[in-house]
Design a protein with these regions (language model features):
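Conserved acidic donor-binding segment of nucleotide-sugar-dependent glycosyltransferases
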Residues: 332, 336-344, 352-358
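Nucleotide-activated donor-binding/catalytic signature segment of Leloir-type glycosyltransferases, i.e.
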Residues: 261-282
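Glycosyltransferase donor-sugar binding loop
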Residues: 62, 222, 247-261, 277
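N-terminal strand-loop element at the rim of the active site
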Residues: 11, 19, 28-35, 47-105
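A conserved mid-protein helix/loop that constitutes part of the nucleotide-sugar donor-binding site
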Residues: 40, 44, 217, 224-240, ...
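Carbohydrate-associated surface elements
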Residues: 184, 203
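Short hydrophobic beta-strand element within catalytic cores of glycosyltransferases
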Residues: 317-320
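A short, well-ordered alpha-helix in the C-terminal region of glycosyltransferases
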Residues: 352, 359-374, 383-385
Length: 401
C-alpha cells in the first residue's frame, strides 16, 4: 500500500497575539483575473491571517468579462466576481517585465481609487507586494498613513530600477519592514536598495494526506507560457520522453492557444499532450496529487519556485532546472536538477525517474516532510502576524510618546 504522509496538527490554531482588532490591506499590482505566483501568495496570505483573527482586504486589479478584456488579454483567465474581501481597483494591461508578461494595473483611475481608499478606509497596516511596481503599489507607498510592510518577489537584474533610482529609494524609506521571499529576491532588491530584508518564503497549502506512490502515468507542467518558464524545452523533449515512458503530459496555467502555437513552432504534434489552461485551486491540487512527477524547466529569473513546494506538499517528486532560485528550494532528497535548456538531460532525468517508483516514493515523502516543516502557510501566517504585532506596538508607543 502507498505510504500516506499526514500533515501534523498545527502547533497553534488560536488567534494572533495582537490584542486589538486589526485590519490589514494587502496590495497587489497585478490582476486578480490572471493566475500568477504573487496573486496566489497574496490569496493564501489573507486566508492564513484571517485564521489568526486578522481582518484583511486584498487590493488588486480585476478584468471583468467582455470585449475589452478579450482584446487586451488574449490568454485565458478567471473572470467571475472576486470574493467579498477583494477590492478591485481597475483593469490591467500586459507589460513585458523580467522575461515575463504580467498583467499590471497602470490606469490613472486606479491611482485615484487607491488614494480614496486609503483616505477613507481604516487600515491599521498595509502590506505591499512588489513595492516598486507602478501604479497601485507606488500609490500605496505615497498615500498610506499607517505602518507599511513590503515583500519583494522578483529575481533578476531589475535594471529598469536604475531609472529614477533616487525616487524609488525615497519611496522605500516609507516602508517600515522589508521582506524577501528568497535569497535570490533579497539579492536582487539589495542591489538597488541596500538595507535589511527578512526572508519569509512563499507558503504552501498542505493537504491533510498525500499518497507518495500509486500515481497515474502523467507528467505535469504548471506555469504560464512565458519564455523563461521553459515550456518550449519540455515540448522539444516530450516526444522522446513519451517514447521511453508511455506517460501523458498535462500542461496547466498556460493559455491553450499560445501552447498550440508553440507546439506548431517546435513541430511537436503529439496526442499524448493535454493542455488544460487555467484550472481552479481544487483541480490543481488534484492534478499534482495524482501525477507521477512535476517538471519545472525554467531557464532563469525565478526567485523561488512555488510550483516546487506545491509538489512537495502533495508528495510529488520534481525534475527542475538547476537555476539559483530552484536550487535553493530543491534538494537531492526531494527531486532532480538538470542544466537549464538541456533537452537531452531533461529527457534522461524524467525518463529515469518515471521508471523508478521506489525512488519517486522516497523523493515524494521527503518533499512532503520539507513542505510541512518549512513552508506551511499556518507557520508563515504566524510569522507575518508577529511582524505586524511588532510594528503596531511601535506605532502605538510612538503615538503615546
Amino acid at each position: 500500500m502507498p505510504h500516506r504522509v499526514t500533515a501534523p496538527t498545527p502547533r497553534s490554531t488560536g488567534r494572533s497575539h495582537i490584542l486589538a482588532p486589526v485590519k490589514v490591506g494587502i496590495v497587489v499590482p497585478f490582476s486578480w483575473s490572471y493566475w500568477g505566483g504573487v496573486n496566489e501568495h497574496a490569496f493564501h496570505q489573507a486566508r492564513a491571517l484571517e485564521k489568526l483573527g486578522i481582518e484583511t482586504r486584498t487590493i488588486i486589479g480585476h478584468d471583468p468579462p467582455g470585449l475589452q478584456t478579450r482584446l487586451l488579454h488574449p490568454r485565458a483567465g478567471r473572470h467571475d466576481r472576486p470574493p467579498a474581501d477583494v477590492i478591485p481597483i481597475g483593469r490591467s494591461v500586459i507589460v513585458p517585465a523580467n522575461a515575463s508578461l504580467p498583467n499590471i494595473v497602470l490606469s490613472p483611475s486606479a491611482i485615484f481609487r487607491i488614494r480614496k481608499l486609503l483616505r477613507e478606509d481604516t487600515f491599521d497596516l498595509i502590506h505591499v507586494h512588489e513595492p516598486m511596481t507602478p501604479a497601485t503599489c507606488v500609490a500605496s507607498l505615497v498615500w498610506a498613513r499607517c505602518p507599511i510592510v513590503a515583500t519583494h518577489h522578483a529575481a533578476g537584474d531589475l535594471g529598469w530600477l536604475r531609472y529614477g533610482q533616487h525616487f524609488w529609494g525615497h519611496l522605500l524609506q516609507r516602508v517600515d519592514y522589508r521582506i524577501a521571499v528568497s535569497e535570490q529576491a533579497k539579492l536582487s532588491a539589495e542591489r538597488w536598495f541596500p538595507g535589511h530584508y527578512e526572508i519569509v518564503p512563499n507558503g504552501v497549502q498542505i493537504p491533510e494526506t498525500a499518497d507518495a506512490g500509486g500515481r497515474a502515468a502523467t507528467i505535469l507542467f504548471i506555469g504560464r507560457h512565458d519564455a523563461r518558464k521553459g515550456l518550449e524545452v519540455l515540448l522539444r523533449a516530450w516526444p522522446e520522453i513519451h517514447r521511453r515512458t508511455g506517460t501523458r503530459l498535462r500542461i496547466i496555467g498556460a493559455d491553450p492557444l499560445a501552447v498550440g502555437l508553440l507546439m506548431a513552432r517546435t513541430h511537436v504534434h503529439d496526442a499524448s499532450i493535454d493542455v488544460l489552461g487555467f484550472v481552479s485551486e481544487e483541480e490543481l491540487t488534484r492534478e499534482v496529487e495524482t501525477a507521477q512527477l512535476l517538471v519545472a524547466p525554467s531557464l532563469g529569473q525565478e526567485s523561488f519556485g512555488m510550483v516546487l513546494t506545491r509538489a512537495f506538499a502533495c508528495a510529488t517528486p520534481v525534475v527542475a532546472s538547476d537555476i539559483p532560485g530552484y536550487a535553493a528550494v530543491l534538494t537531492a532528497e526531494t527531486g532532480v536538477l538538470v542544466p537549464p535548456g538541456d533537452v537531452a538531460a531533461l529527457v534522461d532525468a524524467v525518463s529515469a525517474l518515471s521508471a523508478d517508483e521506489p525512488r519517486r516514493r522516497a523523493l515524494g515523502e521527503a518533499g512532503r516532510r520539507l513542505a510541512i516543516e518549512r513552508y506551511s502557510w499556518d507557520d508563515i501566517g504566524r510569522r507575518l502576524a508577529a511582524i505586524y504585532e511588532g510594528l503596531l506596538a511601535q506605532a502605538r508607543a510612538g503615538s503615546a510618546a
